[in-house]
Amino acid sequence: MIGLLPTTAIFLATAPTDLRKAYDGLAVLVRQSLGQDPLSGSLYVFCNRRRDRIKILFWEEGGYWLCARRLEEGTFRWPQTEGACACYRREELLLLLGGIDLKQTQARKWYRRAAEKK
């Protein structure tokens, strides 16, 4: 995706969304339902009721980007959380888009060793 940095905030709308909406309709949902500013540079991810389509709205200098994905088979494993939106990390979004069920995955602890002294 364009401009997806590790520091970019990602918000998933937890309720099903009418994906006939385009730029302006989704921006209104971001303001009213999610309580966020659509011009902040964050990614806002929406899913339809059948969970086979996703739209991602984000603002980049000069205008909105709207990305869409439709699955030919199966569904996205959409999170069931309380509240209007869920905050995700970049890695979690990539797993979700790849069809991975995040409830059945577990992050492993990892670290880098300090440079060995010679």
How should these model regions be labeled?
Residues 1-118:
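Polybasic/polar functional segments that serve as interface/processing modules
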